[in-house]
Structure formats: C-alpha cells, structure tokens
C-alpha cells in the first residue's frame, strides 16, 4: 500500500510539473499500430486461447470426475469397513459371551469337584476314625481282659490247684477265640 501511495505522489508531481501530457495526434502516438496489433492478437490469439481454455476445461472436468470416482470408491470402502467393523464387534461380543459362559461352567465344575473331593476326604477321615476307634476299643478290651485275667490268676493261684487253674485258662482262651 505504501508503494502505491508513493507511485501516485510521483506521478501527480510529474503531471504538475508538465512532464506528462496528452498528445492528440493519432499517427504520431502509434495508436493505429497499437489498435491493429491488439486486434491481431485478439483475432489470432482468440483461437489459441479458446483451444487452451477448452483443453484446460477438459483437464479440470477430468480431474473432477476422477476425484468424484475416488470419492465414490472411498465411500464404498468406508461402508465396507463399517460393515466389517460391525461384524467384528458381533464376533467379539459372541467370543466374550462364550468366554463368560465357559468361565462360569469351569468355575461350577471346579466348585463341584472341590465339594466332592471334600466329601470324599471327610468320608475317608470318618472311616479311618471309626476304624481307629474300633482298634483302640479292641486294644483296651484286650488289655482289660488281660488285667482281669492276671488278677483272677493271682487270686486263684492261692486258692486253686494247678489242674483247676489250667482248666479255667483253657476255657477262657477258647471263649476269646470265638
């Protein structure tokens, strides 16, 4: 803007000093030559310019068509991608659902198996306890019987003869075997 202002100021100072003036003589100023030259340029150049503009217009239209085709292809690919995404999301949801179902089934199976194992171990422990109790009772009973026999034997040693003692012992031993 500043340059334009400076140019106007210089041009107006030239006009004011008389450096620039209008010459009305057509032949001296070459106005006719300039008009012929300008007309020839327009006449001859218009065809070339017209052809150039038509060619440029065709290139632009071709580029627009190509861009529209690429846009349609991109839109189609976008639709396909969206469809694939939806299908992938459905597959993912199905996989998640299957995984949750499988996890629940595995959890249930593990819990059931654990309960069964606990019941089996408890039953085995109870069975062992019953067996051990029976063994302990038998041992206690055997011990009590042997103590009683010892006591009776001691008491009878002083009162019974050897033959009578032997008969009592044989009878008691046969009862124990039964």
Swiss-Prot record:
GO molecular function: ATP binding; proton-transporting ATP synthase activity, rotational mechanism
Keyword terms: ATP synthesis, ATP-binding, CF(0), Chloroplast, Hydrogen ion transport, Ion transport, Membrane, Nucleotide-binding, Plastid, Thylakoid, Transmembrane, Transmembrane helix, Transport
Bilayer topology term: Single-pass membrane protein
InterPro entries: ATP_synth_b/b'su_bac/chlpt
Major location category of this protein: plastid
Pfam assignment, any one: ATP-synt_B
Recorded GO CC terms: chloroplast thylakoid membrane; proton-transporting ATP synthase complex
Keyword Ion transport among record annotations: yes
Cystines in this chain: none
Subunit structure comment from the entry: F-type ATPases have 2 components, F(1) - the catalytic core - and F(0) - the membrane proton channel. F(1) has five subunits: alpha(3), beta(3), gamma(1), delta(1), epsilon(1). F(0) has four main subunits: a(1), b(1), b'(1) and c(10-14). The alpha and beta chains form an alternating ring which encloses part of the gamma chain. F(1) is attached to F(0) by a central stalk formed by the gamma and epsilon chains, while a peripheral stalk is formed by the delta, b and b' chains.
Further remark: In plastids the F-type ATPase is also known as CF(1)CF(0).
Identification of the protein by name: ATP synthase subunit b, chloroplastic
Native source species: Ochrosphaera neapolitana
Gene that this polypeptide is encoded by: atpF
